[in-house]
A protein has these predicted regions:
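Cysteine endopeptidase catalytic domains of the caspase/legumain-like
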Residues: 1-282
Length: 282
């Protein structure tokens, strides 16, 4: 990490390999009517009674059968996320150490609630992971299984509204050694794709480890919270996420006692299916 000597070891959110130590739809569309006209056809409407919910799932301790270690530092992430999204105006809730069934049941319950008076929805997942998978305390579940609960054909009160998922978890076991660089609408009924209006912000690129400092929390979540607090009332969400990418890419480097794990880099991966610009209300 930058800013002088790191205050704790960096580790990863993934399964331990053998001999390794601890660190480590068819698019059918749905009909909807936008009852509130937009002043800007390319900007999401934030004029609702509530900004919306931010649901945090924070998994730290795992059953022995999973071979997953304790995610030290994740409570720091959870605390930062709670403070950041509360300040932005969200109604924040947190569920700690959730099994696979508990994760699915929780998000199923939330997806079936009435969000008609909310402008958007946010979910933050803090856990171990693998390619396309996220871990509950007792095993793994495909991330898509959780995401699709909020599709337009399943959660109709969030149709046409932004649904943001932030995922701090590994997506494989690849290590990035880094490389040297030289410098720097109207009221009408429409049909939209059921997968529209989602944004997935992954802590790392597909196939790679995601780093987490055991004392300070993860690189991605700490950077996300810092940029949201700094620019959340000014910039569009993709501009904010670009700054998150920049901070993680340039300001962090792994410090680890594990052979081959030191001096590694990380780049978040932002997948957007948003159909308009998203600005948090001032």
């Amino acid at each position: 990490m930058s800013d002088g000597k790191p205050s704790g070891e960096d580790t990863v959110d993934a399964r331990k390999e053998k001999g390794q130590g601890t660190p480590f739809l068819t698019d059918a569309g749905v009909d909807y009517t936008d009852a509130k006209p937009h002043s800007d056809a390319f900007q999401y409407n934030m004029n609702y009674g509530s900004l919306g919910q931010c649901v945090i799932i924070n998994n730290k301790n795992f059953h022995r059968k999973t071979s997953m270690g304790v995610r030290n530092g994740t409570d720091e992430d959870a605390k930062s996320v709670m403070a950041t999204f509360s300040k932005l105006g969200f109604k924040v809730s947190i569920a700690n150490d959730q099994t696979v069934s508990e994760m699915k049941n929780l998000l199923t319950k939330v997806s079936r609630e009435d969000h008609s008076k909310s402008a958007m929805f946010v979910c933050v997942l803090l856990s171990h992971g693998d390619d396309g998978m996220i871990y509950g305390t007792d095993g793994a579940i495909p991330m898509k299984t959780l995401f699709e609960l909020f599709r337009g054909d399943r959660c109709t009160s969030l149709v046409g509204k932004p649904k943001l998922f932030f995922i701090q978890a590994c997506r494989g076991t690849g290590l990035d050694p880094g490389v040297e660089s030289d410098g720097e609408s109207e009221m009408e009924t429409k049909r939209i794709p059921v997968e529209a209006d989602f944004l997935y912000a992954y802590s790392t690129a597909p196939g790679y480890y995601a780093w987490r400092n055991v004392i300070q929390g993860s690189w991605f979540i700490s950077s996300l919270c810092e940029m949201l607090l700094k620019y959340g009332k000014q910039l569009e969400i993709m501009q904010i996420m670009t700054r998150v990418n920049h901070k993680v890419a340039f300001d962090f480097e792994s410090y680890s006692n594990m052979p081959g794990f030191g001096g590694k880099k990380q780049i978040p991966c932002i997948v957007s299916m948003l159909t308009k610009d998203l600005y948090f209300p001032k």
